[in-house]
Each structure stands twice: as C-alpha cells, then as structure tokens.
C-alpha cells in the first residue's frame, strides 16, 4: 500500500503557467458558486459533521460531509500576515502564513492545535516518514507567485493561496465528491470567486491585486468542474460563528510567526492516502 504523507510536486515553471484569463474576454467565464446552507441556523461543524468514509482501495478516512448530501464535503481555509499595515515594522518584510483544514479527529472533530508544516518536505527524512499528518495543514506563503514573479505578502493573498492549496491537496473528484465547499470569513475570497472575477476580466484587470492567484484558482475550479465536481464558497462573518474558522486561523497565525525554512517558488502540496 502506498505510504501516506504530504509531498511536494515540482515547483511551477513560467512556461507551465495557466492560460491568462484575459483569453476569456470574448467568452463567458463561469465562476464558482455560492453555497446555500440547507439549514441556515446550523453552524458549519454541525452542517458538515466529521464522518468516516470507506473506500475499497484504502483504509477508512475522515471527512467533513454535508449531513443533507453525502456527496459534498467542507474544506476550511484561512491566512494571516504579520508585520504589514501601518503598524508593521517598515524595516522588515511582511510574512504570511496559510492554512486549511480537510479532516479532524474522530473523537473530537478537530485535532489538537496543529503545528505548522516546515518546508521542504522530504520523503527520505525518517521523521517525515513517521509523522502523523493532522487534519489542518499550515505553511508559509511562498516568496514567488505561480508565474515566478516576486510578490509581497498580505493577508488577502495568504487566504487566497490557502484556497488553492486546499483544492490541490487531494484529487477530490476521484474520492467521489460532487461538491467541495470552501468555508472562509473573507468576503474578498467569496465575492471574488463567485461574482467579481468576470467583471475584473471584462475591465482588463486594471492592476487588480493577486491576478496570478485568481487565474490559478479559476483554472482549478474549471478542471474540477470538468470532472463533475463543483466548487462552492461559504462565507461566515467571523471566527466565533465556527470552531473550524477559529482553529484554522490559529494555524495560519502560527505559520506566519514560526521560524523555519521558506519556499521561494510556488509549490503544490499533495496529500497521499490522507
């Protein structure tokens, strides 16, 4: 049986970057959809309780599954940036952390406080091979975008990067899911992915921030849709509405503040048998 763990795909190359979304200006782009809760009064962790999923080719694994539709799962994302804004130290660059939660502990729905992942991952490292991968993955935002250009860290970018990492982490369509719901407390992410993106393209972007990540995200959404898996976004107004948001936010903050090896280049994280 294949060993479980987190592995890095080769860093992105400029020549392999996604098609620029300006190519869509003559066609109608189909953005992601908004998730409408089946029961609006339920907290996300009640609407998507942790359930054990069985599959013929691997051990049972936990996922946050919609109690009203067993073909839908929840992924929770967040990001944090330190040393930015007017109160930041102008002598030091901003440092951002990203995090996403894709499963929990069967006894408590959430793992104990997660430790940030340290780059680089090495499958030959004995500590790596013996690690127990928790359900929340946290990491430092890279210093380059998917097109290879240097970027400045911001909290918006960190959260957007977390969405991409979460959607790329597992082949969700191959697991059999027909909808992946992204839970976040940032309207910029939800409105951008579901409403604003076609407008930005129509207006020629006009120096819109994080264009590289928005193009990367839309490409992933279209790929999953082509495999019969829809991506939807669910906005909660603050972390107190959901334990999921609070725990994922804490992991992102920890990643931003923890000293460690940073990745320069934009890198895909792959969860194997998790």
Summary of predicted features, one role per range:
Residues 5-11, 163-249:
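RNase H catalytic domain
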Residues 97-99, 247, 251:
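Aromatic- and glycine-enriched pocket-lining scaffold segments that form the walls
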Residues 158, 162:
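Loop-to-helix element that buttresses phosphate recognition and phosphoryl-transfer chemistry
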């Amino acid at each position: 049986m294949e060993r479980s763990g987190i592995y890095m795909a080769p860093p992105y190359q400029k020549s392999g970057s996604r098609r620029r979304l300006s190519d869509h200006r003559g066609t109608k782009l189909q953005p992601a959809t908004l998730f409408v809760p089946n029961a609006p009064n339920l907290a996300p962790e009640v609407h998507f309780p942790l359930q054990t999923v069985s599959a013929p080719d691997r051990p049972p694994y936990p996922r946050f599954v919609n109690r009203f539709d067993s073909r839908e799962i929840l992924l929770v994302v967040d990001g944090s940036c330190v040393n930015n804004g007017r109160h930041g130290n102008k002598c030091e660059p901003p440092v951002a952390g990203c995090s996403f939660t894709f499963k929990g502990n069967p006894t408590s729905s959430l793992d104990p406080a997660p430790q940030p992942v340290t780059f680089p991952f090495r499958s030959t490292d004995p500590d790596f091979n013996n690690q127990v991968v928790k359900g929340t993955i946290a990491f430092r935002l890279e210093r380059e975008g998917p097109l290879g250009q240097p970027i400045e860290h911001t909290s918006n970018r960190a959260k957007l990067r977390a969405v991409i990492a979460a959607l790329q982490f597992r082949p969700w369509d191959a697991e059999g899911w027909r909808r992946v719901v992204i839970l976040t407390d940032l309207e910029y992410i939800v409105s951008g992915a579901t409403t604003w993106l076609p407008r930005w393209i129509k207006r020629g972007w006009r120096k819109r921030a994080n264009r590289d990540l928005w193009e990367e995200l839309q490409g992933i959404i279209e790929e999953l849709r082509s495999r019969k898996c829809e991506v939807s976004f669910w906005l909660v107004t603050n972390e107190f509405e959901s334990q999921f948001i609070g725990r994922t936010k804490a992991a992102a903050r920890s990643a931003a503040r923890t000293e460690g090896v940073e990745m320069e280049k934009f890198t895909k994280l792959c969860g194997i048998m998790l």
